Curated annotation (Swiss-Prot):
Function noted in UniProt: Together with its co-chaperonin GroES, plays an essential role in assisting protein folding. The GroEL-GroES system forms a nano-cage that allows encapsulation of the non-native substrate proteins and provides a physical environment optimized to promote and accelerate protein folding.
Organism: Burkholderia cenocepacia (strain HI2424)
Keyword line: ATP-binding, Chaperone, Cytoplasm, Isomerase, Nucleotide-binding
Class in the EC hierarchy, top level: isomerase
Gly residues bias spans: 534-546
Keyword Isomerase: yes
Name listed for the protein in its UniProt record: Chaperonin GroEL 1
Family: Belongs to the chaperonin (HSP60) family.
Molecular function terms, GO-annotated: ATP binding; ATP-dependent protein folding chaperone; isomerase activity; unfolded protein binding
Keyword Nucleotide-binding (UniProt): yes
Disulfide cross-links: none
E.C. no: 5.6.1.7
Length: 546
């Protein structure tokens, strides 16, 4: 085991605070509408230009072990805030730096760090309650667009795209972000349920222009096993043919003579059918087949339910208004399922989301909810160069997270104003002793810091603006983009409550840990081993005349 360096007291804390400051100073230049860019080196390809706080934080790794510990702790603040709320990473970093900086002064003057932390926690809890009180619900398209625009660094086109996407697929719908092919942003909306399986044979295509198979008013047969024997399918095919409607078969696989017969019937125009593989794998496949059954008002033909293909009737088949099957995707539009059953299924899947332990499972379950409840929207980000595309895509993803957070917990005035208002409301708070009161003071000072930084990045005098905003009431604040004092909500400068709340809580949590640290253990740097001696001599006789 390598030898360790153990550092105590102020020496440990001061080194860690140096690391905190290095990271926070690099991150905080990006805050606000007039924040600057940070350029990140890449081991291959061109550098990345970003205004995203968490992207900057993640790149920072310091040479000094103790400084690096401090930097990594604050990096945790940014990552946690990004994971929970999707935005507010720079605000969280600025708050953490301020709490650490102010707190260190009190610790150095001999105050009890544990009491300081209790005071900090008390003030944060009161501030969070106050933020919840002043929060207002975010329901209209205009408000959603405003949140998206602010989060995407005052880019209103991104906010409008996100609001449009949410309007089309609902608040629960899946919205994904992809690289576009043109200079302009585009929005593709898939209504109904789409899953990533296409036709099993190109002979099923009946729309050569789009290279898709379109079925109008079809029946849907769902089966959880492979189908290779056409005899199994004959009874149900005859019933569908009599009804004179097309058929979509979704099974684990359709192969051999079964697939060949379906293709021949399709080409001859005897029976319009398309076969696709069932989506997902294992238990997830069963669950998704069940979802499709509920959406189309059918039943999965499975041994577990006592059904076999030979005994299947039209009553067991699902129905839809229209189904499009492409090379890689199948879209079911307007399934015939009962709304009550679909709602019950959505509730059931939501309950599973609450209990899910892994992020992957949670993401897949959320996709299922969206497919059942609304649809899928894809925002295709357009840009002139790849570097710009990456930067813009990151901003769109941030804005998307922020709008979801706003819909969830509501919005407050942006630009650091909400924290100033919450600060005024808790200014009279007192702790159990003088040290706790000092902890409360630390938080009250830190809550000014985001506004100070926004103003500083805009090139104005921070103290003057903070005093003017603090003297105002309600949503009155400073719009750094225009340099005017306005009603922030009316001007469209809003933040999701969840983002502001999470930033404050995470910043206080990590800063409190730093202040109460009294020893740090780090590996000693390895000394470089001396180079081995000169090159060994050549073989005897080399280069000699024989």
């Amino acid at each position: 085991m390598a030898a360790k360096d153990v550092v105590f007291g102020d020496s440990a804390r001061s080194k860690m605070v140096e690391g905190v400051n290095i990271l926070a100073n690099a991150v905080k230049v990006t805050l606000g509408p007039k924040g600057r860019n940070v350029v990140l080196e890449r081991s291959f390809g061109g550098p990345t230009v970003t205004k995203d706080g968490v992207s900057v934080a993640k790149e920072i790794e310091l040479k000094d072990k103790l400084q690096n510990m401090g930097a990594q702790m604050v990096k945790e603040v940014a990552s946690k805030t990004s994971d929970n709320a999707g935005d507010g990473t720079t605000t969280a970093t600025v708050l953490a730096q301020s709490i650490v900086r102010e707190g260190m002064k009190y610790v150095a003057s001999g105050m009890n760090p544990m009491d300081l932390k209790r005071g900090i926690d008390k003030a944060v809890a009161a501030a969070v309650e106050e933020l919840k009180k002043i929060s207002k619900p975010c329901t209209t398209n205009k408000e959603i667009a405003q949140v998206g625009s602010i989060s995407a660094n005052s880019d209103s086109s991104i906010g409008d795209r996100i609001a449009e996407a949410m309007d089309k697929v609902g608040k629960e719908g899946v919205i994904t972000v992809e690289d576009g092919k043109s200079l302009a942003d585009e929005l593709d909306v898939v209504e109904g349920m789409q899953f990533d399986r296409g036709y099993l044979s190109p002979y099923f295509i009946n729309n050569p222009d789009k290279q898709v198979a379109v079925l109008d008013n079809p029946f849907v047969l769902l089966h959880d096993k492979k189908v290779s024997n056409i005899r199994d399918l004959l009874p149900v095919l005859e019933q569908v043919a009599k009804a004179g409607r097309p058929l979509l078969i979704i099974a684990e696989d359709v192969e051999g003579e079964a697939l060949a017969t379906l293709v021949v019937n399709n080409i001859r125009g005897i029976l319009k059918t398309v076969a696709v593989k069932a989506p997902g794998f294992g238990d997830r496949r069963k669950a998704m087949l069940e979802d499709i059954a509920i959406l189309t008002g059918g039943q999965v033909v499975a041994e577990e339910t006592g059904l076999t293909l030979e005994k299947a009737t039209l009553a067991e088949l699902g129905q839809a208004k229209r189904i499009e099957v492409g090379k890689e995707n199948t879209t079911i539009i307007d399934g015939a399922g009962e709304a009550v059953n679909i709602e019950a299924r959505v509730k059931q899947v939501r309950a599973q989301i609450e209990e899910a332990t892994s992020d992957y499972d949670r993401e897949k379950l959320q996709e299922r909810v969206a497919k059942l409840a609304g649809g899928v929207a894809v925002i295709k980000v357009g840009a002139a160069t790849e570097v710009e595309m990456k930067e813009k895509k990151a901003r769109v993803e941030d804005a998307l997270h922020a709008t979801r957070a706003a819909v969830e917990e509501g919005i407050v005035a942006g630009g650091g104003v909400a924290l100033i208002r919450a600060r005024t409301a808790i200014a009279g708070l007192t702790g159990a002793n003088a040290d706790q009161n000092a902890g409360i003071k630390i938080v009250l000072r830190a809550m000014e810091e985001p506004l100070r930084q926004i103003v500083t990045n805009g090139g104005e005098e921070a103290s003057v603006v903070v005093a003017a905003v603090a003297a105002g009431k309600g949503n009155y604040g400073y719009n750094a983009a225009t340099g005017e004092y306005v009603d922030m909500v009316e001007a469209g400068v809003v933040d999701p409550t969840k983002v502001t709340r999470t930033a404050l809580q995470n910043a206080a949590s990590v800063a409190g840990l730093l202040l109460t640290t009294d020893a740090a253990v780090a590996e000693l740097p390895k000394e470089d081993a001396p180079m081995p001696g000169g090159m060994p001599g050549g073989m005897g006789g080399m280069g000699m005349d024989m």
